Amino acid sequence: MIKNDLTELIVDKSACIGVIGLGYVGLPLIVEFCLNGYRGIGFEVDTKKVEQITAGHSYIVDVTSENVQQCVNNGKLTATTDFSELANCDVIIICVPTPLRKTKDPDMSYIIAAGEEIQKYMRRGQLMILESTTYPGTTDEVLQPMFEEKGFQLDEDFLLAFSPERVDPGNPQYQTHNIPKVVGGVSDDSTEVAALLYRQIVNEVHPVSSARVAEACKLWENTFRAINIGMANEMARLCNTLGIDTWEVVRAAATKPFGFMAFYPGPGIGGHCIPLDPHYLSWKARQHGFDSQFISLAEQVNSGMPAYVVKLVSTALNDVKKAVNGSKVLILGVAYKKDIDDMRESPALSIIDLLRARGADLVYHDPFVPEVTFDHAYTIGEAEPLYNSELTDDLMRNSDCVIICTEHTDIDYRRVCELAPLIVDTRNALSAELRNGSNAKIVRL
């Protein structure tokens, strides 16, 4: 039986693990398998990534080059653009992007492309796992029929499961091995074998009754966050209107030991999950005639935060008798969260675009991001790229306004407070001590 054969391969670590997509999810995953004794083949369409891995270099903050080098040198890890190597894998895990179309509908093209490559080269006796975030039903409605078209039967010829990735880039406390793993198969055998596989590298595995439960689990997690961040952002705007310190309110509320979980406002939401996942859930809801109002309201509030930040900047400049048009604006941090280089859906990009459209002279400093490019299709201002500027005293002193969009720890905020004439702090990066000792006009979210 396929279940018994795969179980034996997994337990004795002779199974070859294939991972399609070597980004923030796929690279840490395959390295973890290789460090635990498995042979891994990473599949990637980006030749530069393949070259870097082959040379023993990591391009992901959560994976050290030392670990990549070790896995490559001992023959456990190879990276390739040749998808025919899928035939040599006993397990194939899909870790590809799942973006949105311009219409905010799910873009399934990456999952479908990965499925088509598997379909070409699959053989009997393989376990396929989808980790990419998607709507409930994708695993059994999209992938299963593709594999069965080849004449293979579930449980007899292949197994199929979904296990949502839970990567938190730049979080050293939670890495692949200690983030609990939810696993749901299209069949009971699929669940059992997939759970066994992940138990080899993850401390805690939580099997569920179906792939759809696992798919819905991930969307529930991130929709919960998006909605609560939306509430925090709305409360911040209300507190500003009332002249109340938003951050002090949150700190006070967080002293309640039950029934409250602290969420914090910001310039908007970014990353590969929070801005996108609720749309997958609401899209699926619409297919069944269900109107997910909470999701829509949260998206409206969160997507409006960059414009609100620009409004704060405009008002602050007006207060010192300056217009946005022609003002020199310095953006501190363009990554979507601190201490990483990931700019996906970063609200800083929207803020830059809105300010450029109003005639501001924009520069940015981010120790992790050397260059920012803009998609012409989504840009209302200039679409020319920007390049990282060194954070010199003159740059801060000569800026009409400094906007803290991302609170990277490497930035010297004391120096910023000493030199910048006007600061808009969207992340509560400036302590009370720094604010009180500064001559700058400081506006906080």
Question: Language-model segments: what does each one mean?
Answer:
Residues 1-445:
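Structural/interface elements that position substrates and couple domains in central-metabolism enzymes
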